[in-house]
A protein has these predicted regions:
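Solvent-exposed interaction patches of small proteins and small membrane subunits
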Residues: 1-105
Length: 105
């Protein structure tokens, strides 16, 4: 039996995502993209953004589609150690997230 999370419980979801993205950019500048520490921080940040976006669709900006970020979130959460999925995660970390976040600004 599946346990589903209720939707639209966090009215500040867009603000939380914006804050997570700001911290993501800070750590990217601080560590650089080749550092494994940044890889872990970025992966967890994208995972959290995907969760917030998927479970709070009513509070997302107009035109924002959470499916790509949530798909990457699933890759991170479930198949993080696989080489092929690691490449997909790196592509999201190195530019894909910035494209998706344009809806928040």
């Amino acid at each position: 039996m599946s346990v589903r999370k209720p939707k639209n419980l966090e009215p500040k979801a867009a603000d939380l995502i914006r804050d997570l993205y700001k911290s993501y950019k800070y750590y990217k500048r601080r560590f650089g993209t080749k550092d494994p520490v940044f890889f872990m921080i970025a992966a967890k940040t994208i995972e959290e953004i995907g969760e917030l976006a998927n479970y709070n669709p009513a509070y997302m900006p107009k035109g924002f589609d959470s499916t790509k970020i949530y798909a990457i979130r699933n890759l991170i959460a479930h198949e993080f150690s696989q080489h092929s999925t690691a490449k997909a995660i790196w592509s999201m970390i190195n530019g894909g997230l910035a494209k998706e976040m344009k809806h928040f600004y």
